[in-house]
Amino acid sequence: MAKTIKITQTRSAIGRLPKHKATLLGLGLRRIGHTVEREDTPAIRGMINAVSFMVKVEE
């Protein structure tokens, strides 16, 4: 079974760059406090890195 990580949106997407909004949607995050579980892959890690100031990650 692949390792998973929990990602929680902690800040609003209002007023952010369209690229950052698209990254949040790509991760499956829609609102503040929303948490999703994703497979721990380099692609997901890159997306998290792009919006690291807006999300909290739990291993």
Swiss-Prot record:
Q: Could you say which protein family the record assigns here?
A: Belongs to the universal ribosomal protein uL30 family.
Q: Which domain of life is it from?
A: Bacteria
InterPro entries reported for this sequence: Ribo_uL30_ferredoxin-like_sf (IPR036919), Ribosomal_uL30_bac-type (IPR005996), Ribosomal_uL30_CS (IPR018038), Ribosomal_uL30_ferredoxin-like (IPR016082)
Subunit comment: Part of the 50S ribosomal subunit.
Q: Gene3D superfamilies recorded for this chain?
A: Ribosomal protein L30, ferredoxin-like fold domain (3.30.1390.20)
Q: Note whether Transferase occurs among the keywords.
A: no
Q: Which UniProt keywords apply?
A: Ribonucleoprotein, Ribosomal protein
Tell me a GO biological process for this protein.
cytoplasmic translation
Instruction: Return the protein name.
Output: Large ribosomal subunit protein uL30
Share any extra remarks. This protein is located near the guanosine triphosphatase center of the 50S subunit.
Q: Name one GO molecular function term.
A: structural constituent of ribosome
Q: Which GO terms describe its cellular component?
A: cytoplasm; cytosolic large ribosomal subunit
